[in-house]
Amino acid sequence: MEPAFGEVNQLGGVFVNGRPLPNAIRLRIVELAQLGIRPCDISRQLRVSHGCVSKILARYNETGSILPGAIGGSKPRVTTPTVVKHIRTYKQRDPGIFAWEIRDRLLADGVCDKYNVPSVSSISRILRNKIGNLAQQGHYDSYKQHQPAPQPALPYNHIYSYPSPITAAAAKVPTPPGVPAIPGSVALPRTWPSSHSVTDILGIRSITDQGVSDSSPYHSPKVEEWSSLGRNNFSAAAPHAVNGLEKGALEQEAKYGQAPNGLPAVSSFVSASSMAPYPTPAQVSPYMTYSAAPSGYVAGHGWQHAGSTPLSPHNCDIPTSLAFKGMQAAREGSHSVAASAL
């Protein structure tokens, strides 16, 4: 008689989840298998899952029984409180003892016999779940006693420290003897101004970095000196070139400076030591006056053809209307044009 409650499997049979198959169906499965019917046919005929049929037949072939559950009954519980107490004692005496050593000692001390002694896996589980917490707590207490006081955490990275008024004051004021010096990286972080000035955008170095830059052969002015810097400070350079730049180019940049705006008045000049030298410009042929179309000028390559001359690198004749002038005359003409434009 089928139970009144249960679930329906894919074959249409009714089963109860978690309950063994009835003994009558088990016996019928074994009888059909002895008649030579395949397990898949038995599964479709009795509407029992194929896995259940295979499991029952495998158990019958091994043990000769069709009853569910363990044949010899369940194993009695071996991890009694007495055994756990002895295991804890062994672990406290020798914290580095292994599970198999505990098992051998239980047998040697007569706590257990060969029938009820716990397995190595059971002893490991007891050590991990019941005794491991106590051992870890003891190790933590001993470690906490020997642990030094924690160092105060830095508010930011000490390698790339932001300049601050406190660090600047500490750099100026000498430290009295007997008082430990406070490193600049432990100071409070910089309070950024509300207005975005040119000094903040360019990231001008503060006084705290002056000690690092003193070793360099170039002189870098302080923050207080930036407002007093002007065009006259750069007049002591060479008359023809300043750090690889021509004098005319510097004068043109000085004349066409940025227009004043609403930002705080900060000089836009940068010291020559902080500027990387510009690459040397390529030598250009002397200036020439021309009467042909502008499209006739093509920038020549550095190499020359085998049959060409320095004046005609592409082995072509230059029109007679192109009259070359000397370098000095061309420069004088360019200066006069620049003066008239101003």
Curated annotation (Swiss-Prot):
This is Paired box protein Pax-9. The gene is Pax9. It is found in: Nucleus. One of its GO terms (molecular function) is sequence-specific double-stranded DNA binding. Interacts with KDM5B. PANTHER family: PAIRED BOX PROTEIN PAX-6-RELATED-RELATED, PAIRED BOX PROTEIN PAX-9. It comes from Rattus norvegicus. Residues 7-63 are annotated as: PAI subdomain. One of its GO terms (biological process) is regulation of odontogenesis. Keywords: Developmental protein, DNA-binding, Nucleus, Paired box, Transcription, Transcription regulation. It comes from the Eukaryota.
